[in-house]
Amino acid sequence: MNITQIRNATIVVKYANKKFLIDPMLAEKGTYATFPETIRQDLFNPLVSLPTSIDNILDGVDAVIVTHLHLDHFDDVAKNVLPKNIKMFVQNEADAKEVKASGFKNVEVLHQDTVFEGIQLVKTKGEHGRGEELLNLMGDVCGLVFKHPSEKVLYVAGDTVWYDAIEDEIHTHQPEIIVVNGGDNQRLDLGSLIMGKEDIYEVHKAAPHAKIISVHMEAVNHWTLSREELKNFSKEKGFSSNILVPEDGESYTF
């Protein structure tokens, strides 16, 4: 498999000879307003440019996976540039309805037993923050596990914090590669929305032999954990050899 960090949560996964585009936010730097109740209110999103052209990103894509419909995972540019007949996977019927309303004709809801071109796609749980108020505000999210006889097991956790269900997913699926959204993006009033460094350390402790790739970093205004801080923390805690913190455009092959 090959995993390319594009920007924020947008990644390209080549797995069992198929190309998946996950959580496409494809706008130019500074297109959108800041998120409310967050730091850096003077900056527009995304904070950085794409590392390559949209044509390069879309070239040869077999399917798109949208873990949830927040702007930094599925934006207006993605809705406009993606072919309307491309295979789209979403987390539930509500998201399917919205994606279809944007003109997409080949939309499927992920389940535990979804299969695409011989690749098993297992929908996994997630919680987009902590506390009832924040969870109600942020709405449902998912991750997914990729499985195929010719590949290692890949777990893409999505927009979630560490909690017991993530540990359960790791123990159930025994992933060898885990992609976490690790920028510790926060609301000033309600706290962390995704994983911070301590969450990522818990992922490592639950899967000590897995390679962890941390994405969703330094690309939208409400990030609080930098790549540099995460790298330093992983050295302090002794798991730097297990974690990869890609720059935008960087690729890994497993």
Curated annotation (Swiss-Prot):
Originating organism: Bacillus subtilis (strain 168)
Domain of life: Bacteria
EC number(s) given by UniProt: 3.-.-.-
Keyword Lipid biosynthesis: no
Keyword Hydrolase: yes
Gene: yddR
Pfam families, A to Z: Lactamase_B_2
Protein name, per record: UPF0173 protein YddR
Keyword annotations of the record: Hydrolase
Enzyme class: hydrolase
